Amino acid sequence: MKASDVRGFTADQLKDELAKLKKEQFNLRFQKATGQLEKSSRINEVRKDIARVKTIARQKAAEVKA
């Protein structure tokens, strides 16, 4: 997921995307613990996607206040 794609989302879409990514992160951690995870790099990708979404949500909130 690119930051430019995320910037086009509304606040509600950002919340939904964040919830979806956190759920995926939980599932990936569970798969890792049980030894079923095939693509371990996906954990880092999801973690960075979560950071992107949170950063852009924070920036949008700051724009509204300013």
From Swiss-Prot:
InterPro entries, alphabetized: Ribosomal_protein_uL29, Ribosomal_uL29, Ribosomal_uL29_CS, Ribosomal_uL29_sf
Single GO cellular component term: cytosolic large ribosomal subunit
Pfam families attached to this UniProt entry: Ribosomal_L29
Gene3D superfamilies, per the entry: 1.10.287.310
Single GO MF descriptor: structural constituent of ribosome
Protein keywords: Ribonucleoprotein, Ribosomal protein
A biological process from GO: translation
Source species, domain of life: Bacteria
PANTHER family tied to this protein: 60S RIBOSOMAL PROTEIN L35/50S RIBOSOMAL PROTEIN L29 (PTHR10916), LARGE RIBOSOMAL SUBUNIT PROTEIN UL29C (PTHR10916:SF0)
Family to which the UniProt record says this protein belongs: Belongs to the universal ribosomal protein uL29 family.
Name of protein: Large ribosomal subunit protein uL29
Taxonomic source organism: Rhizobium leguminosarum bv. trifolii (strain WSM2304)
Gene name of the record: rpmC
